[in-house]
C-alpha cells in the first residue's frame, strides 16, 4: 500500500504542469493539522508528539516539479483561523517550516473548518479543511516484545492513516510515520484511495513497557479549497488520533 501511495504521489508531481511562473504556479503549501482524543487523566510530555492539537505548514517555491523541497520559503506570514480559535500566528521553527501548538492556543474541534492563510512576498494564499473525528480503531491491548501491530479502522473513511507510538515508562517516542518535510507531507496527503489499516512494525515495541499508540485518519482538502498556490502540488489534511494503551510484558 505504501508503494502504491508513493507511485500515486509521483504521478501527481509529474502531472503538475510544465510551467512554474507566477505566484499561483510556483508556491507550494503543505499543511497537516493533528489532534488527539485524550482519555480523561492521561497526559503525555511534548516529546511524545501526541499533542491535543498541532499544525505544521511547509512552504516552498517550485523550480522543478520533481523536487518540491528545492527552495523552502522563509519569512512568510502564516496564520490559522477557526471558529474555536480566532486568529493565531504560526512560528517558523525551521527554514520553510511553520508550527502552531495547543500551548499557543490551538484547539482541535471535530466538525469545525480549519483555515490556514499564508503570505509570500505580498501575495496571499489559503487552504481549508473540515476537521474529522478520531477513527474507531482496533489495536491489541497486549503484545509480545517485537510483535507487529496491525491497526484496523472499524468506523470512518480516510485517505490515509497517521500513527505514533510512545513508550510511557521510558518517555521515548519509538515510532511514527509523521512527515518531516514538504515532500513527505505531500506523499502522505496525496492519496485518493480509502485506507483502513496500518502496519506498525515490531521495532516500536522492543522492550517490556506500557505504550500509548495514537492512530488518526486523514481527511484531505479538496483542490477547490486551496487558493493562491500551486493547486496540483499543495495539500492540507487533518486527523484526530484515537489513543490506545498497549502493554508489552517481560518474557
Task: Name each model-derived stretch.
Residues 1-3:
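Sec-dependent signal peptide recognition
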Residues 6-9:
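C-terminal motif of bacterial Sec signal peptides marking the signal peptidase cleavage site
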Residues 11-121, 126-132, 162-166, 187-191, ...:
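Ser/Thr/Pro- and often Gln-rich low-complexity regulatory segments
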Residues 133-196:
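Short helix-loop boundary/capping segments
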Amino acid at each position: 500500500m505504501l508503494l502504491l501511495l508513493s507511485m500515486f504521489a509521483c504521478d501527481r508531481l509529474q502531472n503538475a504542469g510544465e510551467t512554474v511562473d507566477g505566484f499561483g504556479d510556483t508556491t507550494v503549501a503543505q499543511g497537516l493539522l493533528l489532534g488527539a482524543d485524550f482519555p480523561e487523566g492521561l497526559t503525555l510530555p511534548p516529546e511524545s508528539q501526541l499533542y491535543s492539537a498541532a499544525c505544521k505548514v511547509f512552504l516552498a517555491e517550485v523550480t522543478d516539479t520533481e523536487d518540491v523541497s528545492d527552495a523552502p520559503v522563509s519569512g512568510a506570514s502564516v496564520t490559522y483561523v477557526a471558529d474555536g480559535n480566532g486568529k493565531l500566528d504560526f512560528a517558523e521553527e525551521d527554514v520553510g517550516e511553520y508550527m502552531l501548538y495547543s500551548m499557543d492556543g490551538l484547539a482541535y474541534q471535530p466538525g469545525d473548518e480549519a483555515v490556514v492563510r499564508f503570505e509570500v512576498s505580498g501575495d496571499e494564499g489559503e487552504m481549508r479543511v473540515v476537521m474529522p473525528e478520531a477513527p474507531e480503531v482496533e489495536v491489541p491491548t497486549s503484545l509480545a516484545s517485537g510483535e507487529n501491530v496491525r491497526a484496523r479502522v472499524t468506523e470512518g473513511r480516510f485517505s490515509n492513516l497517521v500513527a505514533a507510538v510512545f513508550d510511557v515508562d521510558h518517555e521515548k517516542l519509538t515510532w511514527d510515520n509523521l512527515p518531516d518535510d514538504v515532500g513527505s507531507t505531500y506523499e502522505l496527503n496525496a492519496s485518493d484511495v480509502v485506507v483502513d489499516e496500518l502496519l506498525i512494525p515490531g521495532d516500536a515495541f522492543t522492550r517490556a513497557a506500557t505504550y500509548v499508540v495514537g492512530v488518526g485518519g486523514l481527511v484531505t482538502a479538496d483542490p477547490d479549497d486551496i487558493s493562491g498556490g500551486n493547486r496540483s502540488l499543495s495539500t492540507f489534511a487533518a486527523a484526530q488520533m484515537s489513543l490506545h494503551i498497549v502493554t508489552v510484558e517481560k518474557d
